[in-house]
Amino acid sequence: MLAQHLPVVVIGAGPVGLSAAVQLLDRGLDVLVLEAADDVGASQRDWGHVRLFSPWRYNVDKAAARHLEASGWVPPPPDDMPTGLELQQRYLLPLANLPLLSGRIRRNRRVTAITRVGVDKTRSAGRGDVPFLVRTHEEDILARAVIDASGTWWTPNPLGAAGISARGEAALAHRIHYGIPDVLGAHRERYAGKTTLVVGAGHSAANSLLPLVELASATPGTKVVWATRSADLTRVFGGGEADGLPARGRLGSALRELVDSGALQLVQHFRIDSLREVAGKLEVAGLRDGAPHVVRGVDAIIAATGQRPDLGMDRELRLGVDPALESVLALAPLIDPNVHSCGSVRPHGAVELAHPEPDFYIIGSKSYGRAPTFLLATGYEQARSVAAMIAGDREAALRVELDLPETGVCSSTRSAPAQDAGGGCCAPAKSACC
């Protein structure tokens, strides 16, 4: 069965998935975008109250912008920093509604498996000539190529220090928020007058801790406990006034001041093992500095512990995945968070993103696996390069067209006036993770 007349299937209608669709359409290829949620940009909507650290100029794909502007779209001020909701409503929704894309996006289509027609993972002969079969709950779709841009937002890391859920975590999931809740807005009542344990040592944790302390100053009985696996908080505190990104420096400095002032209780070097409910309160147990330790009297937990990729849908394909990071294999030495910040990751494209499975690519944050060093501008460059490679334009695929400022861009901070926005997701210098 010849596959060349079939569409390229893009999984995920977030910023990078829609960018890939535009790039493919610009090259004359048929495209079908499958989105598990009820609309595009569902992840951005979920953290809609959080303000990106990077300005609009680095959050809009250039190819997409050309089509939008041709339709009369007025771009937001390039140096303003959007919230997640603004990114969805002012960019992703207008993009998805363009005639170019509107009929090619299928919402509420969760992909459950990807394979080859009539061919399982073990068969090699003629494998690359057989179309892909992309299965959703509603239908099977045949494709000439598949781009997985489904992201990692919906698969957060658990609280357990060993990389698995802590004992009791699943049963108490209704007391845990994974990610960044809207503490001063939609989720205020959940935390007002309560004791909240925030787990994590990155900027997602900072973006929960700062509003929680603000809430505590206005609402009696509100208490904040911050638990970190590491004893070193340098990454989240940052460089202060010496930070190349001033707003990120302000965020870290504000958090450091809160810790120094005693406005929150800090539990460092704490490795969580179990959770249980006692008389309506949570007890969180584990090891602190190698000795048993229990945090008691907790009403709610915020798990700001990062994300990991869900590779379940891809398991019948021949993947090249790093055993530690679960990133695309060739990217691992480039993005290892033990070595690199976002800014030190060199530009890469279709060659690095290729798998042993021909014409299958993972792009966007999922391509980085568990590494927190992904930036949105890099995702757009990935999409451009992969689209060129699928279209047979290897020369264009090998070109580097990524343009970032000297100090880099980063995300994110909770919603605030744009000039006061700050945050970040990875350590030194130019960094971003949106």
Which stretches of residues belong to each language-model region?
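Feature captures the FAD/FMN-dependent oxidoreductase FAD-binding
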Residues: 74-155, 273-284, 297-300
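A Rossmann-like FAD-binding core segment of flavoenzymes
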Residues: 113, 213-322, 388, 394-406
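C-terminal, flexible cofactor-proximal segment of oxidoreductases
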Residues: 308, 314-315, 323-434
